[in-house]
Amino acid sequence: MANLKDIRDRIKSVKNTRKITEAMRLVAAAKVRRAQEQVLRSRPFADRLSRILENLQSRMRFEEADAPLMEQRTVETITLVAITGDRGLCGGYNANIIKRTEQRFAELKGKGFNVKLVVIGSKAISYFSNRDYPIQAKITGLEQVPTADEANTIATDMLAEFMAAGTDRVEMVFTKFINLVSCKPVLQTLLPLDPQDIADPEDEIFNLTTDQGRLTVEPGTSSANTAPKIPSDIVFEQSPDQLLNALLPLYLQNQLLRCLQESAASELASRMTAMNNASDNAKELAKTLTLDYNKARQAAITQEILEVVGGSAAAGG
């Protein structure tokens, strides 16, 4: 049986590890809530912008207009954008995105397309750089809660590449936040743009609460303040194509920001779940080690008693 000191050291190490994972779980839980609130705050603007673009798009069907960002070209070159995190300890979050990106890359190459990668996050950069993928751009160091300025910088580069005919389509692989324990890697086409209704009547949110003295997260719902429908008879001062070409870059920035926000929320939720599982496992391991320690201590005491009894019997004999 293991030495008592070794078991004591392991118990101490496991308990210290549990303190760390529990702290990381609480930090991730607080940041998940903040990330969700950011998504909810931006939804009314995104909804109103989407409705305006739909209205303009429907009018353009009956007019001669030119909207380069919506132009459906013959596709030869595709830019594939993958969003991962800069850090680990978040379960399968990064691995799932990398796997989905590799699958999509193989699909497109199999169909004869020229594919370029734009990788966001140090995990994707490290993985694809070591495997000789055609990487066009590497982006890292984004805020944990993405900002509009960061989305605008990335969107500007995408627009320049698309308008210069450097790429015919831009696809984004990111993690869609479904709920606290469920996140799904999804594929979305960013360019050419196709405005559509993005309103979601109800968003699931999570509130910090306590359960038997322990901080935890409780799911709930919050109705989104969606924008009203745009009247069909509204009169715009500018022509539809002028408005469309002015608003489409803003729409792209907003869509990209949403992808970054959902990815950030998914990473934090995955980290919270991973740290929660690690804390539970550490608790169970500490119990097992404590039981082993008590058994070893009992065996040592029993052995000492037997030796004393044996010695007394020998002396008396």
UniProtKB/Swiss-Prot annotation:
Keyword RNA-binding: no
Keyword entries, A-Z: ATP synthesis, CF(1), Hydrogen ion transport, Ion transport, Membrane, Thylakoid, Transport
GO CC terms, sorted: plasma membrane-derived thylakoid membrane; proton-transporting ATP synthase complex
Matching Gene3D superfamilies: 3.40.1380.10, ATP synthase, gamma subunit, helix hairpin domain (1.10.287.80)
Membrane topology, as annotated: Peripheral membrane protein
Compartment(s) where it occurs, according to its Swiss-Prot or TrEMBL record: Cellular thylakoid membrane
Annotated GO MF terms: ATP binding; proton-transporting ATP synthase activity, rotational mechanism
CDD domains (alphabetical): F1-ATPase_gamma (cd12151)
Family in the record: Belongs to the ATPase gamma chain family.
Record's subunit section: F-type ATPases have 2 components, CF(1) - the catalytic core - and CF(0) - the membrane proton channel. CF(1) has five subunits: alpha(3), beta(3), gamma(1), delta(1), epsilon(1). CF(0) has three main subunits: a, b and c.
Function recorded in the entry: Produces ATP from ADP in the presence of a proton gradient across the membrane. The gamma chain is believed to be important in regulating ATPase activity and the flow of protons through the CF(0) complex.
Protein name: ATP synthase gamma chain
Source organism (scientific name): Synechococcus sp. (strain CC9902)
Gene name, Swiss-Prot/TrEMBL: atpG
